[in-house]
Design a protein with these regions (language model features):
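Pre-Walker A (pre-P-loop) alpha-helix and adjacent loop at the N terminus of AAA/AAA+ ATPase modules
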Residues: 37-82
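Alpha-helical scaffold elements adjacent to nucleotide-binding pockets in ATP/GTP-utilizing enzyme cores
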Residues: 59, 95-96, 117, 162-167
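Conserved AAA+/SF3 P-loop NTPase catalytic/coupling segment centered on the Walker-B
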Residues: 141-167
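Conserved P-loop NTPase mechanochemical-coupling segment
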Residues: 46-47, 103-124
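Interdomain "pre-motor" coupling segment immediately N-terminal to P-loop NTPase/helicase cores
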Residues: 1-41
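Conserved alpha-helical scaffold flanking the Walker A/P-loop in AAA+ ATPase domains
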Residues: 124-148
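Walker A/P-loop
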Residues: 75-109, 138
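Conserved catalytic network of the ASCE P-loop NTPase/AAA+ motor domain
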Residues: 70-74, 97-100, 137-142, 158-161
């Protein structure tokens, strides 16, 4: 496969971190569950539990209905949930992932100070590491998990290392 080829083609001076990343990918394997609903999920319970999210659920119903008419796996448009603290945005995302039967990954932006934490650092850097999104996809069971980037408005860091740049 492509990962094996990339590992074999690494130059002798390649970083140990990059080599370890490829090896980790090989150990994890290339197979992931890819969620594709056969029927429209029952959003009614979720809508009763979290009535503030009715408009979002309507959009999701439409996206999922369209997906069901194709051969493609479920891919939802990224969404920004706005609202006061405590209205249930994170809870909504967790419940949505459960309803869809896919993975859930949480990334708290208030504590991130560098852009590479989300997207990963370039292999040219000595201590390069993959980012949180990579970790969710390689270490998770699903190819299309729900990934929550929480408190995006609280992302810190100067413009040179802006964590939002990778989004």
């Amino acid at each position: 496969g492509r990962v094996e080829s990339a590992l074999d083609e690494l130059p002798a001076g390649a970083s140990d971190a990059l080599r370890a990343t490829y090896e980790r990918m090989l150990r994890a394997g290339g197979e992931r569950f890819c969620v594709k609903p056969g029927v429209l999920p029952d959003f009614d319970v979720l809508e009763q539990e979290l009535p503030n999210f009715g408009d979002v659920l309507d959009d999701l119903r439409k996206q999922i209905a369209l997906c069901m008419e194709t051969e493609d796996p479920l891919e939802l448009t990224p969404m920004l949930l706005l609202g006061d603290p405590g209205i249930g945005k994170t809870h909504f995302a967790r419940r949505l992932s459960k309803l869809l039967g896919t993975g859930y990954n949480f990334i708290g932006m208030s504590s991130l100070t560098a852009g590479w934490i989300l997207s990963g650092a370039s292999a040219q850097w000595k201590n390069a590491k993959p980012g949180k999104v990579f970790d969710a996809l390689v270490n998770g069971d699903y190819a299309n998990p729900v990934i929550v980037v929480d408190e995006i408005d609280k992302a810190s860091g100067d413009s040179q290392y802006d964590p939002l740049g990778s989004l």
